[in-house]
Amino acid sequence: RYNAKATFFLSTNCFSAENEELNKINNQLKSLLKEKHEIGLHMHPDSDLALQNALNKKFDYTSSKFYNYSQINQFVKTSKKLIHKNLGINPTSFRWGNWALNTDAVKALQDNGFKIDSSATPGIKGHLNDGMYYDWSKVDENYPWKLSLNDYQDTKHQNSKVLEIPIATFNFMGKTLRADPVYSELLKAAFDYY
């Protein structure tokens, strides 16, 4: 209706499909590209069978915290190649699964030509004791900034070429929450009830 364009962050796991199913997926994604939508990369090493098959290895964690630069760089480079092989594009936007970016991931993104990341959830950290660990608790900015190659949460020393476009967050009764449609419905229901 409004001809709005969107970025779809894609896990390369979809490329683990075979034959007719893979063709169907690729055709759907190519139709999005024809409509001028963007396909970005969404990283989930632990559940991405296409990535695991390409690297001939299983990974146990979502969070970048559990991987070194070399591993992260390999994930990003291989996933980018999978997207190019299947869709003929080189993605330039990125979101780490479960918002679990870290400083090594920022370096890998820059080294692989990514221009935009959208993993930050300012003021929020979670899954501190499991494989989906993420921490954006030091960030209190809700506007875009260039990521730091020294500390991914540092919004002042913007020395990378990767622009962070954070996910909207808000404070509610002393707790920082993602601006998520589910929360909107829950908050509306709570206000209606009380």
Positions of predicted regions on the chain:
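Surface-exposed, active-site-proximal loop segments in enzymatic domains
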Residues: 16-21, 50-66, 178
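Active-site beta->alpha N-cap acidic-glycine motif
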Residues: 1-35
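Acidic-and-aromatic substrate-binding clefts and catalytic sites of carbohydrate-active enzymes
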Residues: 12-25, 47-51, 95-103, 126-127
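Hydrophobic faces of well-ordered beta-strands that scaffold small-molecule active sites
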Residues: 6-8, 39-43, 92-94, 116-118, ...
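CE4/NodB-like, metal-dependent polysaccharide N-deacetylase domain
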Residues: 3-5, 64-98, 165
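Generic structural signal for well-ordered alpha-helices
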Residues: 25-30, 73-80, 106
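A structural motif corresponding to the C-terminal end of an alpha-helix
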Residues: 2-4, 31-36, 82-89, 152-160
